[in-house]
Amino acid sequence: MSWTVPLVRASQRVSSVGANFLCLKMALCPRQAARIPLKGAWRFTSVSKMATVKSELIERFTSEEPVHHSKVSIIGTGSVGMACAISILLKGLIDELALVDLDEGKLKGETMDLQHGSSFTKMPNIVCSKDYFVTANSNLVIITAGARQEKGETRLNLVQRNVALFKLMISNIVQHSPHCKLIIVSNPVDILSYVAWKLSAFPKNRVIGSGCNLDTARFRFLIGQKLGIHSESCHGWILGEHGDSSVPVWSGVNIAGVPLKDLNSDIGTDKDPEQWKNVHEEVIATAYEIIKMKGYTSWAIGLSVADLTESILKNLRRTHPVSTIIKGLYGIDEEVFLSIPCILGENGITHLIKIKLTPEEEDRLKKSAKTLWEIQKELKI
């Protein structure tokens, strides 16, 4: 009796990025093949049939030359990281998205979930790994990962724990994408932007903190709500630290070029009968309110980061209030990162806008700088 010996290949999907790794490839007799366990994700396919289908379906027409490739990597697949990912994908800004996280199960699950929607985003090249090699040759790397504050922990201790994490992340990013731009989203964002700048040794234009871009969006939204006008038509800035000591620039708030301060000279002060200062107080309080209700903030910061990403990758040269080194401006002598209006393009921050501040606004900015410096000077980087 003679046997026909088929050639088979066993492959198992072991990665959420869709890579199939050959685990078995041999000629088997029927008795041997019957003893191979077929449980789990193992799959046997005729090699010759796959090759035939492909060769019958597709014929090479020309050799493919490398083209301009736009790649963004996101470090951290928590609620903020994934909000950044989907916001960027829906804008159609990139050719490749890479995700990195230490939680391999969540990382693969989130990646598969995005991949399965790639028909709707028109961007199928979504990859992931615990290893930073997957981020190689990124144009832009967005860091959302970081340690969370524990009960009773001081801000300095929290920052120091994040410094340890950043040492690992930044060294890997620099190794694989030495020419990338960095957007830091992890909190406290201003201090960690400074840490990333120091650890990476990148030029200052290539390290950008998400800073007050979201604070400013909230500010404009709330002004619009009060006036019954769309937020895009409300012009105003929140500068300084992202957080409780941020500075509302009431002197520059205007609608269609009409300064609100010309209509209400006390706007934003305690003397203001309309209590416009409550708008800024709500900007600060709203994040805490959202966290209290849903446990975290995600969508607005994700959209904010996608907005910054668009300005950089498309070289739009739009102005954003992002965190950058501010030493030498507004009488600030400390080497700190704070938000001021910056022009963003393909090289990162190309110019700073020297926005005119009142003496009171400038004093608040200086106070913000000193608050950050008191923490930064104690850091062990």
Swiss-Prot record:
Residues reported to bind substrate: 155, 187, 218, 297
Keywords in alphabetical order: NAD, Oxidoreductase
Catalytic activity: (S)-lactate + NAD(+) = pyruvate + NADH + H(+)
Binding sites annotated in the UniProt record for NAD(+): 101-106, 148, 187
GO BP term, pick one: lactate metabolic process
GO terms for cellular component: cytoplasm
Keyword Oxidoreductase: yes
GO molecular function, a single term: L-lactate dehydrogenase activity
EC numbers on record: 1.1.1.27
Database matches in InterPro entries: L-lactate/malate_DH, L-lactate_DH, L-lactate_DH_AS, Lactate/malate_DH_C, Lactate/malate_DH_N, Lactate_DH/Glyco_Ohase_4_C, NAD(P)-bd_dom_sf
Active site positions: 242
Enzyme class: oxidoreductase
Pathway annotation from the record: Fermentation; pyruvate fermentation to lactate; (S)-lactate from pyruvate: step 1/1
Family in the record: Belongs to the LDH/MDH superfamily. LDH family.
Official protein name in the record: L-lactate dehydrogenase A-like 6B
Organism: Macaca fascicularis (Crab-eating macaque)
Lineage, highest ranks first: Eukaryota, Metazoa, Chordata, Craniata, Vertebrata
Name of the gene this protein is made from: LDHAL6B
